[in-house]
Regions:
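C-terminal-biased regions
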Residues: 89-90, 97-104, 108-116, 120, ...
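Cysteine-centered motifs
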Residues: 1-2, 11
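Short helix-adjacent coil turns
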Residues: 128-134
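Hydrophobic/aromatic side-chain positions at a characteristic register within alpha-helices
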Residues: 40-43, 126
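Generic helix N-cap/helix-start motif at coil->alpha-helix transitions
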Residues: 29-30, 42-50, 76-84, 113-115
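Structural detector for internal amphipathic alpha-helices that build alpha-solenoid repeat scaffolds
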Residues: 20-26, 49-58, 80-92
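Conserved positions within tetratricopeptide repeat
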Residues: 49-52, 64, 83-86, 98, ...
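Amphipathic alpha-helical scaffolding segments comprising HEAT/armadillo-like alpha-solenoid repeats
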Residues: 27-38, 60-73, 95-109
Length: 212
């Protein structure tokens, strides 16, 4: 949630709240669960956001579908609707969610690493909405990708990014976007930073990392 001292943030928060409240609950609750998931996956951005609460309310039906609840989504993609479906099942039906995936599963979203990094702990943290843990994993992974010097000093220089494996950066970015309703990720924050004139002091409040 954006701090109220940021006028732009307030406007965005109000917009999201209105979209949230605009959900036609009487209509969406009469959809079959398959129809609901179809609209949640293919509807307009505003329609999808208006169905967020309904999807969570019908998690019992979704969990009964098992792995098929995600059959209309692409595991190579970054669709936050798929991420949300996984998160609400983790919130309310964790045992059923575990049964839907094999014991040796690497997570529903496919991940790629050129240096052998295991992204399963990262996906587990994001599915469980343990975002601080996910952030620590991200920071640690970036240092690892940058090399021994970055690991020793504890942070990454901008100049080191160009030498990082692209597949790993894409994987981190995809998973953040998929499990944050499209609000977080390197590409999302870069776009937002550009809209703020490159000012980090304005970025931190907008993404909820700092309140004025």
């Amino acid at each position: 949630c954006c701090p109220i001292s940021d006028i732009v943030g307030v406007c965005l928060a109000i917009r999201d709240w209105l979209l949230f409240m605009s959900s036609d609950k009487s209509y969406s609750t009469h959809l079959s669960i398959e129809e609901l998931l179809e609209q949640f996956s293919k509807g307009s951005s505003s329609k999808r956001r208006s169905l967020i609460r309904t999807v969570e309310e019908r998690v019992d039906e979704i969990s009964l579908l098992g792995y098929d609840s995600l059959s209309i989504f692409d595991p190579e993609g970054d669709d936050w609707a798929a991420g949300w479906i996984l998160q609400v099942q983790q919130r309310h039906k964790p045992d059923e969610l575990r049964k839907s995936f094999s014991v040796d599963s690497k997570g529903w979203f496919k991940t790629h690493s050129l240096v052998g990094i295991d992204y399963l702990p990262f996906q587990k943290a994001l599915i469980s909405e343990s975002f601080e843990e996910a952030d620590r994993f991200t920071s640690s992974t970036l240092r690892q990708l940058a090399g021994e010097a970055a690991e020793s000093r504890g942070y990454v220089y901008f100049s080191e990014v160009k030498n990082m494996p692209g597949d790993d950066l894409v994987t981190l970015d995809r998973l953040w976007r998929a499990y944050s309703q499209g609000r977080f990720g390197f590409s999302v924050q870069a776009k937002l930073l550009g809209s703020l004139g490159g000012r980090y002091d304005r970025l931190w409040p907008r993404i909820g990392w700092k309140e004025d």
